[in-house]
Amino acid sequence: MARLKEIYRKEIAPKLKEELKLANVMEVPRITKITLNMGLGEAIGDKKVIENAVADLEKITGQKVVVTHARKSIAGFKVREGWPIGVKVTLRRERMYEFLDRLLSISLPRVRDFRGLNAKSFDGRGNYSMGVKEQIIFPEIDYDKIDALRGLDITLTTTARNDDEGRALLRAFNFPFRN
């Protein structure tokens, strides 16, 4: 079992049950999935960009990546319907907790000028989104083998009913929020 999952079950869930005054331990908010998305506008001119982004995300997550395609043509962006414009991957269960552990303990401390995560990046339903400016903060990526620095979006989907519950859950996981 993943280290963070064990900590959640034994320490975080009982603590949150008391803190949020919930009747049942099954009501305690939990993280259901983590979605990583890389929007690649530059892929329009060069198809190799998609292949490199797929390789990077597969190294980071250890899971097969899905290529996202344009839903409709937009002349202003020179995009045609069906063209590949991004890559995404959804992590659940064990892989999700393993990734979260690596993100919190290894990757975020490697971010340049890191002052903490924005505590206001919740969507109103307890889900948290954050952006990473460069993929080299992950230890799986070899700095010498990348062709370009690419950012990615990370979204944590929770069962929390509102932002306060979601914030309490992520604080219990020791997320480094700015004050």
From Swiss-Prot:
InterPro entries: Ribosomal_uL5, Ribosomal_uL5_bac-type, Ribosomal_uL5_C, Ribosomal_uL5_CS, Ribosomal_uL5_dom_sf, Ribosomal_uL5_N. Keywords: Ribonucleoprotein, Ribosomal protein, RNA-binding, rRNA-binding, tRNA-binding. One of its GO terms (cellular component) is ribosome. One of its GO terms (molecular function) is rRNA binding. Transmembrane segments: none annotated. GO terms for biological process: translation. NCBIfam families: PRK00010.1. PANTHER family: 60S RIBOSOMAL PROTEIN L11-RELATED. This is one of the proteins that bind and probably mediate the attachment of the 5S RNA into the large ribosomal subunit, where it forms part of the central protuberance. In the 70S ribosome it contacts protein S13 of the 30S subunit (bridge B1b), connecting the 2 subunits; this bridge is implicated in subunit movement. Contacts the P site tRNA; the 5S rRNA and some of its associated proteins might help stabilize positioning of ribosome-bound tRNAs. Part of the 50S ribosomal subunit; part of the 5S rRNA/L5/L18/L25 subcomplex. Contacts the 5S rRNA and the P site tRNA. Forms a bridge to the 30S subunit in the 70S ribosome. Belongs to the universal ribosomal protein uL5 family. This is Large ribosomal subunit protein uL5. It comes from Ectopseudomonas mendocina (strain ymp).
